[in-house]
């Protein structure tokens, strides 16, 4: 089962394709991406009932500062998440990671490695593009998703940028 990987693409895209191929091989954790057991994962929620409060800028700045010492993942859970502003337009989003967590619960760690983007030392997932998709996710599903990331990933700190409309 061969898959063509174009060498004229970003390193992230190449790594994502390699990880995806290894995930499909059966047991990716047997080959690579094992994580050491973490003591505790800190989950930091950033929330403001006031719109335009520069909350996202603050959350990103906090994430970058913490990422100097810890492995940090930033998740934007806002209805209008800043694509085109703070974040690029293209790439896999929180919606893709959430879908993957539903389908391949044991392999979320491998999928995340290919989905995350980087802002300096900070890792992040792009926000969902469609507000309806974000609103359709039940609180139990968000909780399970965050727990999966905490249990299966390398991240020691998760920063959740939470919207008041969620």
Predicted features and spans:
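Structural signal for conserved beta-strand scaffold positions within catalytic alpha/beta enzyme cores
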Residues: 5-6, 48, 74-76, 124-126
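P-loop/Walker-type NTP enzyme "switch/lid" segment
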Residues: 77-150
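Walker A/P-loop NTP-binding active-site region of P-loop NTPases
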Residues: 43-106, 157, 161
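Short loop/turn elements that form and flank the Walker-type P-loop nucleotide-binding site
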Residues: 40, 119, 153-154
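Conserved catalytic-core segment of NTP-binding enzymes
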Residues: 148-166
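Acidic-aromatic/histidine active-site loop/patch
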Residues: 1-41, 92-95, 99-109
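A generic secondary-structure signal
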Residues: 20, 65, 148-149
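Short acidic, S/G/P-rich loop/turn micro-motifs used as interaction or catalytic elements
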Residues: 51-54, 130-135, 164-166
């Amino acid at each position: 089962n061969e898959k063509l990987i174009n060498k004229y693409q970003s390193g992230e895209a190449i790594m994502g394709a390699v990880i995806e191929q290894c995930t499909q091989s059966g047991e990716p954790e047997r080959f690579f991406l094992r994580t050491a057991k973490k003591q505790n994962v800190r989950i930091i929620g950033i929330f403001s009932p006031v719109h335009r409060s520069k909350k996202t800028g603050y959350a990103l700045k906090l994430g970058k500062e913490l990422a100097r010492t810890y492995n940090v993942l930033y998740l934007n859970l806002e209805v209008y998440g800043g694509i085109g502003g703070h974040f690029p337009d293209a790439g896999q989003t929180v919606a893709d990671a959430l879908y993957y967590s539903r389908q391949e619960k044991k392999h979320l760690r491998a999928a995340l490695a290919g989905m995350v983007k980087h802002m300096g030392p900070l890792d992040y997932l792009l926000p969902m593009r469609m507000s309806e998709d974000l609103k359709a996710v039940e609180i139990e599903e968000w909780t399970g998703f965050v727990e999966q990331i905490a249990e299966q990933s390398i991240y020691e700190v998760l920063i959740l940028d939470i919207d008041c409309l969620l």
